[in-house]
Amino acid sequence: MENPEQYFELVQERPDLFANPSGAIITILLGQEEIAQAETSMQEALSAQGVTQEKAREWAQVGVAYHDQYLLVLRDAVRFPDGAIGSYIRLVAPREQTPGVVILPIYQGQILLLRHFRHATRSWHLEIPRGFGWPGCTSEESARRELVEELGAEPLRLVPLGQIHPNTGITAECDELFYAEVATYGTPEKREAIGEILPTPLSLFERLIRENTITDGFTLAAYARARARGLL
């Protein structure tokens, strides 16, 4: 196992991360024998794919694969729906925290898009404000703070649009969507890497979606939810 003490501390401190709810068909295994079996099975599978023995051993280890203030990567021993035992990797929040927030801001009937440089893709994106949840804050309070940071704006109206799980195949991340109406907007904080704020009519916004110019999943989700609620 990789970092077994840290892994089993998590099992005790955050049992919800390791729950097997009724009807779960991918089952987390916590017994030592089952974990050893999962590691052996995965190592053999990786070797069969041409992975070196050293890497196969490393990539098959169950436990905490990586941990910092932003990310916690777990590799769990699991039983798959066909009965096979192996391992499965996932990203979870490093601590219990307020969900992230995503805000669709409306100014004088137009959507405020940000031209935002993102390190992960090394490119510019058209997207709406979003960010981590603030410790000790409600989601609504986090949304208000995010609008101040990225738009220099205070919302006149803030409407919850529900939750989104952006990538259920790899991460447990869950974020809260909001619709916001603002009377004014200003200048984003410099550290936010925002090039400009673009008031965008709905017709143009939808054309940017059709033309594959807007590709940010959070932006698309908030738009779809607001449309379905009759807010746009």
Each language-model region and where it sits:
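Nudix hydrolase/Nudix homology domain
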Residues: 1-41, 120-124, 169-170, 175, ...
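N-terminal positively charged helical leader segments and presequences
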Residues: 23-65
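Short, well-ordered beta-strand micro-motif
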Residues: 75-79, 105, 179-181, 199-201
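Short alpha-helical functional segments enriched in proximate histidine and acidic residues
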Residues: 150
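Conserved Nudix-box catalytic region and its N-terminal flanking loop in Nudix hydrolases
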Residues: 29, 91-94, 98-145, 191
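Active-site-adjacent beta-strand/loop module that shapes the phosphate/pyrophosphate-binding cleft
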Residues: 78-82, 167-186
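A short coil-to-beta-strand element that immediately follows conserved catalytic motifs
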Residues: 154-161
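Acidic, metal-coordinating catalytic segment for phosphate/diphosphate chemistry
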Residues: 57-102
